[in-house]
Amino acid sequence: MSDDVYSISVAQAHEIERAVAARAMAHILLETKSAYCYDDEPFTFTSGRRSPVYIDCRQLISFPRARRKLMDLAVQTIERDIGHESIDVVAGGETAGIAFAAWIAERMGLPMVYVRKQPKGFGRMAQIEGIMPEGARLLLVEDLATDGGSKVNFINAIRQAGGVISDCMVLFHYGIFPASTSTLGEMGVKLHGLATWWDVIEEAEARGYFPPEKVAVVRDFLNAPDGWTPKG
């Protein structure tokens, strides 16, 4: 068997793994009612964007079987796409990323720290809690990414403290805002995730989680999110 055939088969296997993980993540979000489509008033993100949909990954911590499955898939993604040997410390972003970072660090047998949004304002004035050796290679873990803006502060804090970071793992990536990858890309950080809203809406439509009229609204938003406003 030639090297070319072998490399193609490995790539295909990885794509199958990604598709399985995306479908599992989408199904869990819908089954746990962590994926929302608005009824009366659209959702507003911290960036000021309006959206007919919202994902709440924080709810997943209350579902033991679901979170175990997702952590297994997250570790599979990390080891496949980043490499265990490329990570010295797992860092959770305050606050939603902390629990997921802890579970991932435990599964991978790695130290963990968490990064505050701002220095705590007293004592050591620390923004990073835990032990992070100078030059350590960190993986930032967060629950989700919309436009990537909130990750910038965490990345800067890690680097200012002497850490090295080139990857960020999220459970969910909206997948519709180019800035989410370009902003981090400009900082030399690659974004990894299990699923996007495209995966969720396909699963929702296939299994009847959302009625047809809501599916249409979501697809309109996903195709043109900038400046979206509700009709009527």
Identify what each model region corresponds to:
Residues 98:
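Portal/gating segments that form or line small-molecule/metal binding sites
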Residues 2-31, 156-232:
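PRPP-dependent phosphoribosyltransferase catalytic core
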Residues 101-139, 147-153:
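Short, glycine/charge-rich flexible loops or terminal/linker lids adjacent to PRPP-binding catalytic cores
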Residues 84-94, 169-170:
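Short glycine-rich phosphate-binding loop at a beta-alpha junction
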Residues 88, 136, 166:
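Conserved acidic residues
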Residues 48, 90, 112:
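Conserved hydrophobic/aromatic pocket- or pore-lining residues that grip, position, or stack substrates
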Residues 2-84:
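Active-site-facing substrate-recognition patch
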